[in-house]
Each structure stands twice: as C-alpha cells, then as structure tokens.
Design a protein with these regions (language model features):
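N-terminal export signals
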Residues: 7-24
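N-terminal structural segment of carbohydrate-active enzymes
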Residues: 25-80
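Aromatic-lined carbohydrate-binding/catalytic grooves of carbohydrate-active enzymes
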Residues: 66-99, 122-141, 185-186, 190, ...
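Aromatic- and glycine-enriched glycan-recognition loops and surfaces
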Residues: 47-66, 87-110, 226, 397-398, ...
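N-terminal secretory signal peptides
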Residues: 1-3
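Active-site neighborhood of glycoside hydrolase catalytic domains
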Residues: 154-252
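Carbohydrate-binding surfaces of carbohydrate-active enzymes
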Residues: 31, 114, 168, 213-684
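Active-site-adjacent "subsite" loops/lids of carbohydrate-active enzymes
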Residues: 116-169, 206-214
C-alpha cells in the first residue's frame, strides 16, 4: 500500500517513539520542577523546513548543558497549524521531520519532562475553515483569529488535537497559550440568546455606558471558565497524570480565586521591561496555592529598535531572581530557526542562567512568605472598570504596580493580598497599603476597616477609597472627588500629581502632609494626608492617587512623601547604611531603590533575599546594557525577635560575623552583584 506524505510521517514518528530503550529516568512532576525551557514556532502554511535541522545530538547537548527539569515545545501556534503529523487536525505543510518525536525521545532518555505549547482560543486556521466557529465582533463580522467560546471548536477540534498529541508523544502536559488574554467580547447569536435569558436585556451592550455591560463581561468570563474546565477534564481523563495549564489564568490577568483543577499556573512575561512585571506577577501567583512559574523571553523586540536582540545573561538573572525569591519556578523562552536549530549561543546563555538559579534553588523554591507589607489587589476593580474580560490590563493595573514599586524602593518586603483572599490573610500583615483603586467594593471596605480596628496599620490611598471608608473611619471629607493637579514637595523640589482627589475636612492636628496648587510652599497648602485612629489601629488616608502616580512615573519626591506616611506606622525589618565616607551625609545616595528585600522562610530558617536591580529597564524605550554594578560592602540591620545562632550568606555558604543588639542583628554584606540570601538560623 502506498502511503501519502502525512501517513508516512505519522508512521515514522510512531516507529521512532516505539524503539526499545533502556529504562527511562523518572521525570519530575511539575510541582517539583524549578527550571525549564520553552520553544515555540507558531507554524504557518509558509513553512517549508520544519524539523529539518533538528537532531538527537543537538537536543542532547542542550539538555546536558542546561539540565532543565522540563521543556515546552511547540505543537500549535496562533495560526492554527499543527507542528506534528496529525490525523486529527491540519498539520503545517512544511514538516520535513517530526520535531516533537525527537524532543520526546531525547527528553525521556534524560529524565526531562516534555510539555507542548498549544494555542487555544486563538486558531486562525480553524476560523478560516469553519467561519461558524469564529468569535463575532460588535460589527457583525467574524474574527480572523479568535474562536468563539460558544462554538463547537473546542469539542470538535481543540480537545481531539490535544488528546492526540498527549497520547502519541507520551507528553507530560500542556501549556495552553492564546487563552484568557486573547478573549474579547463575543457578539455571536448564542451569546445574545444566553445574555437575554440571564438578564432579560435583548441587546448586547457595546460599551461600559450601555446597560448590562458588567453582566455581559461576567458572562464571557464564565463561558471561558467552562471552556477551560472542559479541556482540562478531557485531558485528565484521556491521560491520567497529565499536567495542564492555561497561560496567565489565575494571575493578575484573571484575578479570581482558583477553582478549576489546573495542575500549575504559568505566564510569559513581556519581552520589554520584564522585571517590573515579574515583581507583581510573582507576588500574585505566590498567593494562589498552586505550583507556579514565570517565563522570561530570552530576547526582546520593539519597533523603536527596528530589530530583535538577545537579552544578556545578567538581565535574565535579575528577572529570575525576582521570580525565585517568591518561591516560584522559572523558565526561558527562545525561538529555534524554522528548521528547528538552536544555536549554541542560546544554549550557553541558558546554561549560565540555569546555573545561577540552581545555586539558589535549595533556599528559594517553595519557600513561604514572612509577612511585612501587604498591597491590596482589587480584582473587583479590574473586572468592574476595564473594557475587556481579562488582562493584560495596561494602565489600569498602575495602582498595584506603583504601590509595589514604591514600597520596594523604601526597603519593605512586599506581598500582594488578592481581594478574594483578604479576609483570611490580611491579619498576618503589620502594614497594609491600599492603592488608589476605583471600585474595591463594600466587602473589601469592611475587611479593611476591621483590620485596622483590630490593631492593623493601614495606608489608604485614593479619593474613591477615602469616600467609601469615610463612614467606618468617621473621616470628615470636604466636597466630592475632583480632578486636580497638585504639587508635592520635599527638600529637593516639587513633583506634580494629577488625578482624582477629595478634600479632607479633618482637624489640623491630624494632617500629616500637604500639597500645593503651584510650586510655591508659602501659600495655598492643601491637606492630602491625615492620620486617623481607628479602634486599636491607625489609618493614614492619602486622598489622591499616590500609588498610580508612582507607577506611572517614579520619583524620589514621592518616596519622600511615602516615607512620611509609612515610617511612623511600620519601619522595614531590613535597613541599609550607605558607606560613602567621601560624601557629606546629606549627599549620600539612597540604596533602597535598587535593592529589593524579600523576607521568606523555609525549613525553620529565616531567609532575607537581596536583589540588586541596578540597570533594570523600567520602560520599553531602553534596553539593558548588560552590566550590573556591584554594591560593594553594605552595612545592614535585620530586625529579629532573638539573637540568631548563625547568619550565612548563600549561595556562597559564607558565615557572616555580626552583633545582635536592641532587637537587631547588625553586620556587613561583603558585596552584592545580582542576588544573595541571608540564611538566618535560630532567630524565630
């Protein structure tokens, strides 16, 4: 019988996978994985050489050099073509050699788990061949890439494709891409019928101004949850032990309590200015109670550059340090050639970063937080005020990003407190900061007021939050919230803060900070912060967008304001003393803005992670220069309840000398390049 090309490739792949081999090393479950690699190609109809240059030796060299716990390799990208020979879906026409078969064979021989990268909601080929599967726009036109969650696409094509790959290649799991972040409102007939049945509203809303807009987005979110539940359950049934996730679900992109049986959580950071995104995403994922990792792109693009460039290893190490310090796993994404080749330069960089991470794995992976400063994260605000079902949220997330950056720049160890978790976890934190969210809701307001009444220290930012809690706090306000631009001052100058402000009608004795209508401190002072006793605790109310202002454009003047508000509430547990003897005291630079402190614990020991973020791009307009300046010796103090038995610098294993006095261990860190851990024994 003569075989056609697809049947020949499928038969060849089966033969490759069926070769008798020695007993394979056991592969780690995802919960035990710490470092991984990701490769995707998004095959298209224009590919002619898929798999041509891929060899067992190349894959083996990569695995032996980098020693990842898992690899994620492409099987379907957003165009919709499969990268392997398939009897279920449409394979890319240019498959010369079955890459997935080679990756499975070699990873299995090395005890490395293999996951496939698989595009879910986004499938351009599916909607081209089946227009009835396409998501419908408000203009009545079918989408060119996005499938409809109300269509037969998932059952008829997506799940069978996933099951075929899982079985034929004995995959350990899937990383489903193009999912929650790709979902936009669907105006198909099925959505219209469902919406009318649930709300009684006959016309689907087009904008937030239309009746039923929030209900419409909530319906889309629920439809997505049902879609994810179906493919997760199907794969768990088809291949028991299969581990699967939906990219970015249950992160800040979908900030809700995890209820679906995803086996792990994961997301790929933006290629530009990724460290800043890593700070907030790592802190959010660490709260969700599931194994998690974050992925750095190993390269960066941008029209402003007119070219693509690999990231230097030190930039990836800074991004990795931010992730692993929160207890998570880490992976790096690179793109092979269309023919499957991975150059040794990519291998060397990945190997360097992997070695950096492995040295820190013992005291990083699956550690637990020591609560210090908690930033309240309002998923409700994002779901109620954004114009899409899920993130990325862009500037709408500035309140949280700004608060995290601001607190880190002042030396605090910072966690996020998701609103769905606040009632059960907020009491652990000696300091809680509520950014200037617009719609935290009455349930959150009650939780926050109760936290302060029980003795908590709370910084409440934003006009809307001040108004919402004014009754509970017995806070007098003067007038409604209005748009203003005020000038905030410290000893060095002024910073403008524009946005929604509300007047404070408190007694002068409660005012702790003022702003000005012009850059002139002689007149027109406007109270912008007040200290309010509440029960056993203290609430500092800042009546404007302090967190968002810092998130949109950090400045040391806003740090000065924040110190004025926060230091009396709770001082950081770790403080640094600059060692610049040639400078006058008033000219000595701040150390905190470039040093991140993360307090963790593991195996009964206190862990102080120190991350040097010098040189990290904070905007996509600039690239990392590949140099991270060392700090030199750092005098530091760590507040501890008892004198420690030992303080060891990891990963060097160097025991540090120091003294314990007045509740603080004081010592000298010889030097800090990118990341180090003070492992403190016997101080709990």
């Amino acid at each position: 019988m003569k075989l056609n090309r697809r049947e020949f490739l499928a038969a060849s792949s089966a033969a490759l996978l069926a070769r008798p081999v020695a007993a394979e090393p056991q592969r780690l479950q995802r919960k035990d994985c710490f470092f991984g690699l990701h490769f995707d190609l998004h095959p298209t109809e224009q590919d002619k050489d898929l798999g041509r240059d891929l060899t067992d030796a190349m894959v083996a060299h990569l695995l032996q050099s980098v020693r990842p716990d898992f690899v994620q390799y492409d099987s379907k990208g957003h165009p919709g073509y499969l990268g392997f020979p398939s009897k279920t879906g449409m394979s890319a026409p240019g498959i010369v050699q079955d890459s997935l078969a080679i990756w499975r064979r070699v990873t299995a021989a090395h005890g490395v788990a293999l996951y496939n990268h698989f595009s879910g909601v986004l499938d351009g080929l599916a909607v081209t061949r089946h227009p009835e599967w396409a998501r419908m726009g408000p203009d009545g036109k079918p989408d060119q890439r996005e499938t409809s969650l109300y269509s037969a696409y998932e059952r008829a094509l997506m799940i069978p494709e996933l099951e075929e790959a899982a079985r034929n290649y004995d995959l350990d799991g899937s990383w489903v891409d193009g999912d929650c972040w790709a979902v936009t409102p669907d105006y198909c007939e099925a959505a219209q019928r469902k919406f009318q049945a649930e709300t009684g509203i006959a016309t689907l809303p087009r904008s937030p101004a239309d009746k039923g807009w929030n209900e419409f987005l909530d319906m889309q979110r629920e439809q997505f949850r049902q879609y994810v539940a179906r493919y997760v359950d199907a794969l768990h049934r088809a291949k028991p032990g299969y581990q699967i996730t939906s990219n970015w679900f249950y992160s800040t992109f979908a900030p809700e309590r995890p209820t679906l049986p995803l086996d792990y959580l994961s997301g790929d950071l933006a290629d530009l200015a990724a460290a800043r995104q890593a700070r907030i995403e790592a802190r959010y994922l660490s709260r969700c109670g599931k194994p998690w990792d974050l992925m750095s792109w190993g390269f960066e693009r941008g029209t402003q550059y007119s070219n693509q460039s690999a990231k230097p290893a030190v930039e990836l190490e800074q991004e990795a340090a931010i992730v692993i310090a929160q207890g998570g796993a880490y992976q790096i994404y690179n793109v092979p050639t269309r023919a499957g080749w991975i150059d040794d330069r990519v291998v060397r960089t990945a190997s360097t970063v992997a070695a950096f991470c492995r040295k820190r794995q013992r005291w990083s992976h699956r550690s637990q937080s020591i609560p210090e400063a908690g930033v309240f994260f309002s998923g409700r605000t994002l779901y109620r005020t954004a114009k899409r079902p899920f993130g990325g949220w862009g500037g709408a997330e500035a309140p949280a990003a700004g608060a995290v950056d601001l607190l880190l720049s002042m030396g605090y160890s910072v966690d996020l407190i998701p609103d769905w978790q606040a009632a059960e976890s907020i009491a652990q934190y000696p300091l809680v900061v509520v950014p200037d969210w617009q719609a935290i809701g009455p349930e959150a307001a009650e939780t926050l007021a109760g936290y302060a009444a029980s003795g908590g220290k709370l910084l409440l930012c934003g006009a809307e939050n001040a108004l919402l809690l004014s009754g509970a706090l017995n806070l007098r306000l003067s007038g409604p919230a209005q748009q203003h631009t005020y000038f905030v001052a410290d000893d060095t100058g002024f910073a403008q803060v524009a946005g929604s402000w509300i007047g404070l009608g408190v007694p002068p004795a409660q005012v702790i900070a003022s702003a000005y209508l012009t850059p002139d401190t002689r007149k027109n002072a406007v109270p912008i912060a007040a200290r309010i006793p509440h029960g056993k605790g203290i609430v500092v109310v800042c009546s404007g967008p302090l967190a968002s202002a810092y998130g949109n454009g950090d400045t040391p003047i806003l740090r000065s304001l924040a110190r004025l508000l926060l230091q009396p509430l709770h001082a950081p547990a770790v403080t640094f003393e600059g060692d610049y003897p040639e400078l006058e005291p008033e000219l000595k630079p701040e150390l905190e803005p470039e040093l991140e402190v993360v307090l963790r614990k593991k195996d009964g020991q206190t862990l102080v992670h120190l991350i040097n973020t010098a040189g990290v791009p904070v905007t996509g307009q600039f690239r990392h220069q590949g140099v991270v300046a060392r700090t030199g010796p750092l005098r530091l103090r760590v507040r501890l309840p008892h004198a420690p038995a030992s303080v060891t610098l990891e990963p060097q294993g160097t025991v540090l000398s120091g003294a314990y006095k007045a509740g603080e261990w004081r010592g000298v860190l010889p030097d800090l390049h990118i990341h180090a851990i003070l492992r403190i024994a016997g101080a709990e």
